[in-house]
Amino acid sequence: MKEAKIENIDFGNALSERYLAYALSTIMSRSLPDVRDGLKPVHRRLLYAMLQLRLEPNSGYKKCARVVGDVIGKYHPHGDVAVYDTLVRLAQHFSLRYPLIDGQGNFGSIDGDNAAAMRYTESRMTEICMLLMEDIDKDTVDFRSTYDDSDLEPVIMPASFPNLLANGSEGIAVGMATNIPPHNLHELCDALLYLIDNPQAGINDIMNFIKGPDFPTGGIIIDKAEVINAAYTTGRGSFRVRSRWEKEELSYGTYQIVVTEIPYQIQKSKLIEQIAILLKDKKIPLISSIRDESTDIIRVVIEPRDRSCDPQIVMESLFKLTNLESRIQLNMNVIGSNNVPRVMNILEILQEFLVHRKNIIIRRSTYLLNKIKQRLEILKVLRIVYLNLDEIIEIIREEDEPKTIIMERFKISAIQVEVILNTRLRSLQKLEEHAIIDEHSNLQKQQAILEKILKNHKELWQIVKKEIKAVQTKFGLNTIIGARRTSFEEVDLTNQVVDITAFITKEPITIICSKMGWVRSLKGHNTDLSTIKYKEGDTEKFIIEAYTTDKILIISSKGRFFTLLADNISKGKGTGGVSIKLLVDIGNNDITNILVYKPNQLLLLASSIGKGFLVNSNEVIAQTKTGKQIMNIPEGYSCIACLPVNGDSIACIGESRRLLVFNIDEIPEMKKGQGVVLQRFKNAKLLDIKIFNKQDGLSWNDGTKIQLEKNIVAFLGKRGGFGTFPPIGFPKNNRFSP
């Protein structure tokens, strides 16, 4: 037995080479579409397999299992699930703007329901799909061997329509991704026709025809025109898409809101579930219920809390909190005609498509021209046969080598003789001279046209235009499938601030947060704290008086701010309440302070490293549960204070037991960061700060009573100083309060 050859190689080099091969495989053979036909290899192989099975629009359906079997057996040696999922998506009217497959059976729903098993469903190609493979049998594209060299598959499709932009594409490769939304085919054809007539046109000229994406699920794009144009110019950007809704009047002056279209790629069932959860958690007090009345069309009914609610405000609150408004990404990363992936702008994609179509027509014309020349040679032979039929028959019957005799007698080629010898006698007898002459004349006319196309650049582009116009006529705005579904509406998002608190009854409450992080609210102010019960080993930490309409600021020890609506805090005198971790994503961090939000209020932030800064309260409002990072805290330190600025001076004291007092004007106002040095230390940390008015003196609580120091001259200094020893009687824990 021959011994295996073992080669020693560097592991790092081997790993990098194999990873590079894998990365290139995912980019070129799996995840990114080709700019010319807009297809990935799995799409191309699937559609070509269906063409081979003759699953044309006017033919019968075949089981999807049969189609998938042919694809994975002949062209695509991967799992059947991946191929079937691809087939299903190409048939879903809510996934593709122009479906390429006509499915029969359960192909899933916009609710996220899965399609039936492939043994139950059937499919065939759509008319627009046939345009992708039109003239594929006329040598218009190159073919290559399949994975096992048993068959051939097309490298690219002829693509008579711009499928990449019409249906869009998405995929994630190694180190790159693509996300191209669908567009309206009529508008794309207009842009292509203009580009043929005006080769020097720019993106701004093209954008006069292409308004923006056209999603299969409709919706409303609310971005401004300049934002949309900027995205198409760079090939990267995003679009904000809102659901389409209408107000339905009911009896007694009541109404309900009906959502008829939702953003692209949003599952309706999950959207309704999202709204229902927010409704249960009292995050959207403007509505009372939501229900799904959808059939073949989307109909989601939202009932307002009462008829006094403005439907526009109701919807603005839902747009802000739910996927009724969604952001669709644009990343036009595709494989170019040179097989190099890159991000293209919309003009480059259209130009690549036009060049592709020009090459297809050149190859098709060349192929047809060669076929015509071959047929003309045959017709020439047939006319000779017609005029000399008896002589030819006699030569065939009498001579041992009729081929040579016929070639010499009639001065024709060996190929032409083969045509004569391979023609049946019955066919020879039926020859008619006028039919041969007519066909010869017609073919010569066609030959002249094709030669003119190949020689004349303008004629070639006229054919491209003619075919694009034919596609536009068949799938234009006047057709059911071609009518634009997504509309545009500029919305000034800066003015779309929904004050939900306006719909909450204003009532006084007392918010209590324990040391263990349990928070609750009690009705009224001046609450008898002795009646409040806590969990075993727990006690109060923060007690603040607020109103149900207030926003509550929660500051963590890591400098992150969280915002809660006071009305959403659990109510009741029972032990505990609700853990703060269920309301905000504070993690295992401690709570530094809890404050009632007041607009444009200055807050002083300080960390144990001795730094701090002023921040406007408007800058710390967090819109999500994850909060907003305001103060950057180094590892090993924490945010020790967040205080409203209600004085002209600040007192700082740390582990070094040095007290420093300086004017609060020395501290800068910032939006976020670490801040500036408040008090300097050597191997110590800042423990506490206090804001006060200099004329009132500095006070502190020693645990028994409030102490006051009127003469603070000895402790005055500049920001960033070390400070001096505090007054006699200052607490030994170096804090202004116990």
From Swiss-Prot:
Chief location of this protein within or outside the cell: membrane
Catalytic residue positions: Y120 (o-(5'-phospho-dna)-tyrosine intermediate)
One Gene Ontology cellular component annotation held by this UniProt entry: chromosome
SUPFAM superfamilies in UniProt: GyrA/ParC C-terminal domain-like (SSF101904), Type II DNA topoisomerase (SSF56719)
Gene Ontology process terms (BP): chromosome segregation; DNA topological change
InterPro entries: GyrA/parC_rep, Gyrase/topoIV_suA_C, Topo_IIA-like_dom_sf, Topo_IIA_A/C_ab, Topo_IIA_A_a_sf, Topo_IIA_dom_A, TopoIV_A_Gneg, Type_II_DNA_Topoisomerases
Top-rank taxon: Bacteria
Record key words, sorted: Cell membrane, DNA-binding, Isomerase, Membrane, Topoisomerase
Transition state stabilizer, annotated site positions: R119
CDD domains: TOP4c
Membrane topology note: Peripheral membrane protein
Enzyme Commission no: 5.6.2.2
Chain positions of site Interaction with DNA: K40, H76, H78
Any one GO MF annotation of this record: DNA binding
Record-linked Gene3D superfamilies: 3.30.1360.40, DNA gyrase/topoisomerase IV, subunit A, C-terminal, Topoisomerase II, domain 5, Topoisomerase, domain 3
Catalytic activity: ATP-dependent breakage, passage and rejoining of double-stranded DNA
Domain Topo IIA-type catalytic: from-to ranges: 32-496
Function: Topoisomerase IV is essential for chromosome segregation. It relaxes supercoiled DNA. Performs the decatenation events required during the replication of a circular DNA molecule.
Family: Belongs to the type II topoisomerase GyrA/ParC subunit family. ParC type 1 subfamily.
Subunit structure: Heterotetramer composed of ParC and ParE.
Protein known as: DNA topoisomerase 4 subunit A
Organism: Rickettsia prowazekii (strain Madrid E)
